[in-house]
Amino acid sequence: MSEIPFWQSKTLDEMTDVQWESLCDGCGQCCLHKLMDEDSDEIYFTNVACKQLNIKTCQCRNYERRFEYEPDCIKLTRDNLPTFEWLPHTCAYRLLAEGKGLPTWHPLLTGSKVEMHGERISVRHIAVKESEVQDWEDHILNHPKRA
């Protein structure tokens, strides 16, 4: 008899920190800069990557110290999860909070990020370095459901 995976047997609140962190598929979509319209508060998504994002691997270069390097970096927690409506529809945190399952390409199911990159879920195919961008408004995207 096989053991039920933790994401099916526990609520987000019941997960350990290690389990919580492992839900992140590493797509890098959280690490793309967003712009907010000052009049409407509407959020616009760009393909401009945070300076700390390694675009090839879609990993933070300084994850443990990211807030020192990027004070505006977000920390997704169990408490603030409901406030991040902009999370991608493929995000495990969002899906589990909505009572849905993980997508078939998720690294917890496949054992690697290969399928996620192959499905073009990650930002590696669309992200540009912040240092190479002059006008962020030229890099506004629709919500990156599929990068």
Curated annotation (Swiss-Prot):
PANTHER family (alphabetical): UPF0260 PROTEIN YCGN
Pfam family, one: CxxCxxCC
Annotated family: Belongs to the UPF0260 family.
Listed name of the protein: UPF0260 protein Ent638_2368
InterPro entries reported in the protein's UniProt record: Puta_zinc/iron-chelating_dom, UCP006173
Organism (species): Enterobacter sp. (strain 638)
